[in-house]
Amino acid sequence: MDGTNGHPVVDELVDRIDRDGESTVVYLSGELDLLVSPDLQTLLDTECERHPRRLCLDLTGVDFLDSSALHVFVHTHKRLAGESARLELVSCTPAVRRLLSLTSLDWLLATCASSPTAAQRCLRLM
């Protein structure tokens, strides 16, 4: 387990970060909206600089997300894909899955099943 960078907004968004070899799981919580998206992007860019083969975002604790959060996810997906790596959204709520479907991003962004061990499986799969 690893902490965040001590930034107040990021500390409120991130419950914890687990890194295991080539995989990283970021456990997010709260509301992912325009107010926090720039800080979320900075955090994910920092994680991308570690060159994981798989970056999983566990959304179990996320209450709300808007189009700015989707933009962060797409940007991160493209960055990782350019490095032959993968972004996965883990434990998406029905509302998040519906938003991905309505925006046609469900074909672009990989999702993992909603279960307590889904994020841990991401760590073991690579």
Model-predicted segments: where are they?
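Conserved G/P- and acidic residue-centered "switch" motifs that form tight phosphate/ATP-binding loops
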Residues: 66
